[in-house]
């Protein structure tokens, strides 16, 4: 359950996330009858966005803040604190000025927190042997059917946002565990604070179960 006092959520936009996002969105835009029936990736193919390397920083990694009721009068402040006590101030900027400009659309401007949940929806694949026919996949408004079929994007995806702030992480961060703390303040002075934990390592560990740790074999 979401805390009723909560007003925002945080995420990291990494190069891997943007590549993953772009590939699935490209598939989504293809003709339904001629495209491959299975999307190019699922959520299982997205590398952990809370585990970074220097390569991720060099390619551009942003801390993103979706302030749900954010406006041009909202103020957003952020800090990074490493596990040894070192602290860095970040300067989040709103991705849209809200001055009547065209929306910025695409991986660079997407909300990673929302998009990760929208681009690989598992309930499309729900299926059973003895259940009712209408319980396979899922139903939407007026009984429209979805699935059963491989997990895929839902209808609406957060590929643009009028209340998203972001701050690029420094390229020269040292390895360690970091906590990003973000406070947003609305025009009435009401503040909301959230934190996001991530780790910066020299290299990523293996993604899958390591039998060599247990049995001494690859």
Question: Which residues does each predicted region cover?
Answer:
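Metal-dependent phosphoesterase/phosphodiesterase active-site architecture
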Residues: 1-218
């Amino acid at each position: 359950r979401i805390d009723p006092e909560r007003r925002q959520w945080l995420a990291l936009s990494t190069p891997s996330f943007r590549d993953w996002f772009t590939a699935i969105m490209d598939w989504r835009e293809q003709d339904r009858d001629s495209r491959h029936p299975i999307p190019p990736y699922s959520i299982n193919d997205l590398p952990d966005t809370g585990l970074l390397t220097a390569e991720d920083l060099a390619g551009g990694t942003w801390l993103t803040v979706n302030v749900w009721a954010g406006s041009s009068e909202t103020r957003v402040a952020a800090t990074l604190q490493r596990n040894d006590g070192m602290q860095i101030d970040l300067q989040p900027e709103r991705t849209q000025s809200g001055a009547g400009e065209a929306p910025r659309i695409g991986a660079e401007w997407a909300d990673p927190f929302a998009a990760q949940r929208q681009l690989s929806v598992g309930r499309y694949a729900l299926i059973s042997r003895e259940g009712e026919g209408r319980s396979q996949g899922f139903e939407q408004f007026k009984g429209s059917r979805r699935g059963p079929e491989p997990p895929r994007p839902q209808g609406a995806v957060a590929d643009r946002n009028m209340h998203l702030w972001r701050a690029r992480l420094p390229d020269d961060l040292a390895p360690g565990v970091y906590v990003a703390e973000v406070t947003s303040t609305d025009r009435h002075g009401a503040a909301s604070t959230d934190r996001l934990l991530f780790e910066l390592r020299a290299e990523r560990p293996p993604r899958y179960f390591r039998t060599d740790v247990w049995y001494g074999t690859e």
